[in-house]
Amino acid sequence: SYVLADNDAREAVVVDPRSRDLPVLQALLGERDLRLRWVLRTHQHDHLLTHELERLRSMGAPVVQGETREGTHTVADGERLPVGHESLRVITTPGHTAGCLSFAWRDRVFCGGLLAVDACPHQPHPADPAALWDSINLRLFTLPDETLLFAGHEQRARAVSTVLEQRRWHPFFARQTRDAFLARVAALPTHAAAAATMAPGHNIPSA
């Protein structure tokens, strides 16, 4: 979960809040006397839809996501979402899920499950590997080198990197052709295969 706030205007936005974080987030907003302007979701998975969406709507702000669902606010590429005297720019970045979004604010981008720092794509299979390649290379890696990328999943305790670092060193995208990437992703195990081969007591990575 990420929180951005304009303290002068007393408005805030939360990005990808997890259900277990909601009490803490609501306490933080109350303590700082902040009005929640938006709940932003970079992506959602159908098996989490009903429970998660109901809890997010209970926060009292519009829920923004790429997939059109009753009770959510759908946005377009390039749209600006005001937060006090600031705004976040919507970037459509499909691939991890069909409706995956990223949100840019100043020199940083919140990209959720689209890109894990120095790690393979999550799920373990992206919904659309070709779209994922295009989103990473054409939407994220074309941003200024110093742009900070805030991922939705930690890898070795890291969830933040830069465009330059990931463009140069990401094991799935740096110095890779599109065809090589697609072949590599196709060879990744499915959830079912991973579950069959993992020892008891281990968890399958999820997105």
Feature map (PLM): residue ranges:
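Catalytic core of the metallo-beta-lactamase
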Residues: 1-36, 71-151
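Active-site metal-binding motif and surrounding structural segment of the metallo-beta-lactamase
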Residues: 19-65
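Glycine-rich, phosphate-binding/catalytic loops in enzymes
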Residues: 31-32, 57-58, 127-128, 166-169
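Conserved beta-strand edge residues that scaffold enzyme active sites
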Residues: 43, 69-70, 154
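Active-site His/Glu-centered metal-binding helix of metallohydrolases
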Residues: 45, 49, 98, 115, ...
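Short loop/helix-cap segments at secondary-structure boundaries that form the rim of catalytic
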Residues: 56, 68-73
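Accessory terminal helices/loops
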Residues: 131-207
